[in-house]
Amino acid sequence: MRTHCCGELSLSVLNQTVCLCGWVDRRRDLGGLIFIDMRDFSGIVQVFFDPEQQALFEQASSLRNEFCIQITGKVKARPHHQINQKMLTGAVEVFSENLTIINCSEPLPLDRNQNNTEEQRLRYRYLDLRRPEMLARLKTRSKITSFVRQFLDKEGFLDVETPTLTKATPEGARDYLVPSRVQKGKFYALPQSPQLFKQLLMVSGVDRYYQIVKCFRDEDLRADRQPEFTQIDIETSFMTAQQVRTVTEKLIRQLWLQIKNIHLGAFPVMTFEEAIRRFGSDKPDLRNPLELVDLDDVLKNVDFKVFSEPANDAHSRVVGIRVPNGADISRKQIDEYTAFVHIYAARGLAWLKIKQADAGLEGIQSPIAKFLSPEILERILKRTQAKDGDLLFFGADKKKIVTDAMGALRLKLGLDRQLTQLDRWAPLWVIDFPMFSNDTETGLTAMHHPFTSPKNTNLSEFAANPETALANAYDMVINGYEVGGGSVRIHHSDLQQQVFSLIGIEANQQKQQFGFLLEALKYGAPPHAGIAFGLDRLVMLLTGTNNIRDVIAFPKTTAAACLMTDAPSFASDSSLQELFIDVVKKEKK
């Protein structure tokens, strides 16, 4: 139906007759002349209709935005003063010789100026995707997946598909369950990840596996989460954690070079402990220069219980954040920051402005100044490296509260004070995660997943101190986003059973849910390790959006609904009967 795409036209096809198909992006009537901007997936070109061709001109006058049309015409050079430098095709235009209206369009339910709610955009997604920036993101996504496949193929990885209908296993989030019509009363689960199958592929001798795969998690959603999402899933045999990091760092560095023409350089490596201590997060945004500074030892003996009590408690923490040139922050703004940390259960936010550092207590402004001695103030200023004109914020409470609250405050201050270098890329590896987290109600839970190997695989030593065990795990973080996470896996059945037992999975449950894995590990399972990257999150970063729904063609809302198709929907009684399912209506209290 066409010889060229709209965005391809240039002076190289001057005076050639072309046939184009696409949509009317805009029609302009200028002093008896009609011009349209014609758009397809490749771009926009200007089309001119000559009023001397009366029938064609009258036909063109009926065109409206988003009519689907076919144009045949000759490519002409625009007069020099009419060249549009903002368009790739701005040096040429098409003199129309024939117009076919393929399909008309009703007035759009979306605002052409893009002042649309997200609900409108999702309800009419097929129209929202016509916008050039949305199509550009889909093109970038396609380039990314194509590059990843080529890279991994060259590195000797084998693309293997794993089942979508599988067995429910506890992996952290709730499963999406699919009832079986054939097996009465039984359910499949949609995979939260191909974790167990890719480990079984290693037992099978596949050696190097990858898959770009859909995963499903029934969890509460955020701006960067979806109930169905896509992973770049990787697993290897006979490779160490360092070797996995090396090959996947190479992948990401080359990907950034391919898509953004940016050299990332070698990724720094940071332990989990250091990340939490300095940045209040296990996915630190290193574009932000602010850090959390521990002050426990400095404030242990201060005559101020808000500081001294947590400073002397092993389960608590006192930290400071130095805001360069922050003394101009108003009391109203300080109150707003105090309200902000309340979100994270912090009880308050102490502050101190440095007017003249070498003037001692006379040189500061702070409601806590009366509790500080000149010696303690000097130690605070030295530890935080505070200077004239700076502001210090203090957090003091249980470790988790302080870490979460001050870590979040650090990020907010970085943006508010324009300290975060938004034009930078700051990747890193975070390693040496705790093997388990300890919940007062549920006991030990796996920090990553229960198939991660501890760094120390000595069974007796591991069993003696599981709370202090480190996982042989690693996360890749870019600009504060965890883009990938992986680990060395357990490849001995007895160690796997021990980990299951530690997190409260009893022997019978182990056999019922993971018997196939425990059995497979007994048949010469090789050492293996892997990683998974969130494709949606990578595309989000590489296209410069902060909403993951912008990089998925047909995403769900935060209520896990598709507004366009009205999914999920009710099933008919006959369908439910076939599946042996009764829907029980909850009685109103």
Swiss-Prot record:
InterPro entries: Aa-tRNA-synt_II (IPR004364), aa-tRNA-synth_II (IPR006195), aa-tRNA-synth_II/BPL/LPL (IPR045864), Asp-tRNA-ligase_1 (IPR004524), Asp-tRNA-ligase_1_N (IPR047089), Asp/Asn-tRNA-synth_IIb (IPR002312), AspRS_core (IPR047090), GAD-like_sf (IPR004115)
Cellular compartments annotated: Cytoplasm
Gene Ontology CC entries for this record: cytoplasm
Span list, region Aspartate: 195-198
Binding site for L-aspartate: 171, 217, 448, 489
Molecular function terms from GO: aspartate-tRNA ligase activity; ATP binding; nucleic acid binding
Main enzyme class: ligase
Assembly with partners or alone: Homodimer.
Identification of the protein by name: Aspartate--tRNA ligase
Organism for this UniProt entry: Hamiltonella defensa subsp. Acyrthosiphon pisum (strain 5AT)
